[in-house]
Regions:
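A structured beta-alpha segment of the ubiquitous adenosine-cofactor-binding alpha/beta core
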Residues: 95-111, 116
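Beta-strand-loop-alpha-helix segment that lines the small-molecule cofactor/substrate pocket
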Residues: 119-120, 124-172, 186
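N-terminal Rossmann-like dinucleotide-binding module
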Residues: 23-91, 170-173, 183, 279
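Short, solvent-exposed turn/loop segments enriched in Gly/Ser/Thr/Pro and often Arg
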Residues: 80, 117-122, 143-145, 150, ...
């Protein structure tokens, strides 16, 4: 347990089964087992990193902004000048590229680390090219689009000894650690069932036709955007009125790609790395025995469905019993779960209208940046909200529920606002003594690792196995029936069609390494 800091470890009922639980298990879903980087010749904590970014618009802009206050941004790459315009203006003097391969070649000596924030289908190749050149990488979630790519990146991180982090910010949050420590302390007994839900997709899914071909905008390099994926005509879809995009843009990009089999991983790929972060850490989840999509609506030959329910069956892990995890997406409201008291708030908390952004459900926008470690449950705020129901604003339904033999715990989207159910149990509740190292914030965690510090909390030793089991659910959306998985052979034992989706195909002229 070298990677963990034990503070005031109590030898009371809170940790009655902790020793046997943690023996050999915690690093699997905590901070990983990568050796310290201090002797690897990396920059000292007082030196600034030279960071490049593959992707400059959209989510990449906030990743870059989170690193810019303390580090140097030295190169930017984006295939879409329109999407990247605001970031390019902010960093006017920084070299700009459209092809990430050219950027890595031209700027090799100037770059220490790279942010990879592009559509899912390009994560694997881009991260691999960076690591092969000795660059530390911060890769947005999901780590990859396929299981094979996730395993390749894990092996590369070990081989090239670079600092890594997946962009599932909730893994750094205080609440994620709180729920792990509560469960390890036996607060709700044995956990054999977990439910997790999201309102995503907030982009089109389940479409059944593709609009006619249109000219490619001058600002977009369509060939580079497609990357490893098969060539297809560009279309905006704007004139049909059938393809809504809440964030502007075109039929495939810059945002709708998440819903397509060839480019994204649907709602599960978008949000599971956040919402299921707390279950992954607390329950030490590894490969499931089986996965099955047990319900789906609005299906398509080339897109993920509009709504789905997926069931994962995990075997026993050490002294932890088998657990069944249910994933719901396309939710308009929180699923009704047996045993939850009527009117109980699950997942993300509401907040008081006019109460400012510091309320339970409304964090400041800047809080998502460098040192943010999440919103915590506050009993006084909870009481105040219960007294003024007419002034409450409810966020979209997102969250998770742990069902134990002695009680329940719920968490929000990013492992925040951890609390027992019913929440009245929190009035005089004292959390267990901290066992896990606290994060300085997801970006600082990675930057520290790049400078020789301890491995980041969602380094690829953690992120790759997490991504792998999540991606099995993505495959289950495309194949009917229960899929039985052999992690040693990396294959489904009862469905050859499903095995086709474990590894990507590469368009001619594109190579993974």
């Amino acid at each position: 347990l070298r990677e963990y800091t034990t503070l005031a470890l109590e030898t009371n009922r809170r940790h009655f089964f902790l020793g046997s639980l943690l023996a050999g298990a915690v690093p699997a879903a905590g901070f990983g087992s990568t050796p310290s980087l201090k002797l690897a010749g990396y920059k000292s904590p007082n030196e600034k990193l030279n960071i490049a970014s593959i992707g400059a618009g959209g989510k990449a802009s906030s990743d870059i902004a989170a690193c810019a206050p303390t580090e140097n941004i030295v190169a930017l790459c984006d295939v879409d000048d329109r999407q990247a315009a605001a970031t390019y203006k902010r960093f006017e003097s920084v070299p700009k590229y459209k092809d990430f391969r050219r950027m890595l070649d031209k700027e090799d000596k100037n770059i220490d680390a790279v942010i990879v924030c592009t559509p899912d289908h390009m994560h694997g190749m881009q991260a691999m090219w960076c690591m092969e050149r000795g660059k530390h990488v911060y890769v947005q979630k999901p780590l990859t689009r396929t299981v094979w790519e996730a395993r390749q990146l894990l092996e590369a991180a070990r081989k090239y000894k670079v600092a890594t982090q997946m962009g599932n910010q909730g893994y750094s949050n205080e609440g994620t650690r709180q729920v792990a420590e509560m469960i390890w302390a036996g607060e709700i007994g044995e956990v054999r069932e977990v439910h997790a839900w999201t309102d995503r997709p907030i982009w089109p899914q389940g479409l059944t036709s593709i609009p006619p071909e249109e000219p490619v905008p001058d600002t977009l390099d369509w060939d580079l955007w497609l990357g490893i994926a098969d060539m297809r005509p560009f279309t905006s879809g704007k004139d049909t009125g059938k393809y809504p995009n809440r964030f502007g843009g075109y039929f495939y990009q810059p945002f709708n790609w998440r819903g397509f089999y060839d480019f994204g991983c649907g709602a599960l790929g978008d949000m599971a790395c956040h919402i299921l972060g707390a279950p992954n850490m607390a329950l030490q989840l590894g490969p499931p025995k089986s996965v099955e999509c047990i319900k789906k609506e609005g299906t398509s030959p080339f897109m993920f469905p509009e709504r789905s329910v997926i069931r994962f069956e995990f075997p026993a892990r050490g002294n932890m019993p088998p657990v069944t995890l249910y994933w719901y997406d396309g939710c308009k409201e929180t699923p009704r779960i047996e045993g939850v008291p009527e009117g109980e708030w699950l997942g993300d908390m509401p907040f008081l209208m006019g109460g400012g952004q510091g309320q339970q459900g409304g964090p400041p926008r800047q809080a998502q940046r460098t040192g943010y470690v999440g919103r915590l449950f506050d009993w006084e705020q909870y009481e105040a909200m219960r007294k003024e129901p007419d002034k409450l604003r409810f966020p979209p339904p997102d969250g998770a529920l742990f069902v134990g033999s002695k009680g329940m715990i719920t968490t929000g989207t990013y492992g925040e606002q951890t609390r027992l159910i019913p929440a009245e149990k929190m009035k005089d509740y004292r959390f267990p003594a901290p066992l896990l190292t606290r994060s300085p914030g997801h970006y600082r965690d990675w930057i520290r690792a790049c400078k020789g510090g301890e491995p980041a909390c969602s380094n690829f030793e953690v992120a790759a196995p997490f991504t792998e089991w999540m991606l099995l659910g993505v495959i289950a959306l495309r194949v009917e029936g229960k899929l039985e998985y052999d992690p040693v052979k990396m294959r489904f034992t009862n469905n050859n069609e499903a095995n086709k989706y474990l590894k990507p195909t590469f368009r001619k002229g594109w190579s993974f390494a």
